[in-house]
Design a protein with these regions (language model features):
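N-terminal cysteine/histidine-rich coordination modules
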Residues: 1-24
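The C-terminal cap of the DNA-recognition helix in HTH/winged-HTH DNA-binding domains
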Residues: 5, 46-47, 77
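A generic, residue-level signal for flexible/boundary positions that often mark functional hotspots
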Residues: 12, 27-30, 55
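Flanking helices and flexible, charged tails adjoining ferredoxin-like Fe-S electron-transfer domains
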Residues: 17-20, 24-35, 42, 64-155
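Ordered, amphipathic secondary-structure segments that act as subunit-interaction surfaces
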Residues: 36-58
């Protein structure tokens, strides 16, 4: 909700850059851009509509340049980018320009499920790689840790 309010001015889950999936009862999984260090979405764009914001480390989409071809959607290992339901332009988390509204709302609400992790100089940043997976894969891994051998029955 915080994401769509920040970017759209209203609660609009279809336009939210953070998706939340409940794939196992009582286990909701946020799915958002990991701001991958190698960012395969950026070079996949044939018109260079995606760029790094050097101040925030976020991947930014130039809506004027985006042709809605979907190359970045296919290149993302986590399947995160999507075409905005109104503009049909590629949409990716832009970290709200520095302090993500989702992380702020999550902390203020006492959930502590999202937080901002400063980009590591290492190419093996676990915090970023966790979200660069599909919701099904993240949920399967979390369910396995929480429920052990019975996880497959729940999924």
């Amino acid at each position: 909700m915080a994401c769509s309010i920040q970017h759209e001015g209203k609660i609009w889950p279809a336009a939210s850059r953070v998706r939340v999936f409940m794939l196992v009862p009582t286990l909701e999984v946020p799915h958002l851009c990991a701001q991958c260090e190698d960012a395969p979405c950026i070079p996949s764009c044939p018109v260079n509509a995606l760029q790094w914001n050097t101040a925030t480390g976020a991947i930014i989409v130039d809506d004027d340049a985006c042709t809605s071809c979907g190359s970045c959607l296919k290149a993302c290992p986590g399947g995160v980018p999507f075409l905005h339901p109104a503009t049909h332009k590629a949409t990716i988390c832009d970290l709200c320009g520095g302090i993500p509204a989702c992380a702020k709302a999550c902390e203020e609400g006492g959930y502590h499920a999202l937080w901002v992790v400063e980009r590591s100089t290492s190419k093996t940043s676990v915090s970023y790689r966790l979200y660069a997976k599909t919701p099904d894969k993240v949920t399967a891994e979390l369910a396995s840790r929480l429920y052990g051998d019975t996880a497959k029955e729940l999924i």
